[in-house]
């Protein structure tokens, strides 16, 4: 049985495309819905939400719909880069990992490659570790990939 969004959990009610949408572009609801649905089928990996469905908050869904749903006449995304500034403890790593997994698994790009950048290896490993855990908790994704850890993770849970 499908897990339903909790009744008291906020949902984006009236999506309005970004004010930065070019006149030559349009909003493709199907493309945006695909990204939202993919992400909302992942699981949180940390804190009180660990193991629960990744129901997007309205501000998160607005970002996803803008980035993946605004396209040109050929269907290419208008936004190839997005700068998103989020305060501490507001799910940056979870959202970044979810977007990276969408780009890797569901964006219809053959041999897709997704890169993460950070000031150092420990910081870069945070999003990778979250994405790795999300894949481990999603049987459909786990069947489609093999994760090879080629470095010693500096994350605290791996220190024993």
Residue ranges and their predicted role:
Residues 1-153, 157-160:
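Phosphate/NTP-binding elements of NTP-utilizing enzymes
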């Amino acid at each position: 049985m499908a897990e339903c969004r909790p009744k008291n959990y906020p949902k984006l009610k009236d999506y309005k495309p970004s004010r930065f949408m070019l006149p030559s572009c349009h909003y493709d609801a199907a493309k945006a819905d695909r990204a939202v649905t993919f992400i909302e089928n992942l699981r949180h990996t940390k804190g009180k939400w660990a193991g629960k469905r990744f129901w997007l908050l309205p501000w998160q869904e607005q970002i996803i719909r803008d980035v993946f749903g605004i396209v040109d006449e050929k269907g290419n995304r208008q936004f190839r880069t997005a700068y998103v500034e989020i305060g501490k403890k507001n799910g940056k790593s979870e959202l970044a990992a979810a977007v990276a997994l969408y780009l890797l698994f569901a964006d219809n790009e053959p041999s897709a490659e997704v890169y993460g950048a950070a000031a150092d290896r420990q910081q870069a490993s945070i999003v990778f570790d979250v994405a790795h855990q999300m894949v481990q908790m999603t049987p459909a994704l786990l069947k489609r990939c093999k994760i090879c850890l080629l470095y010693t993770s500096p994350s605290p849970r791996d220190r024993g």
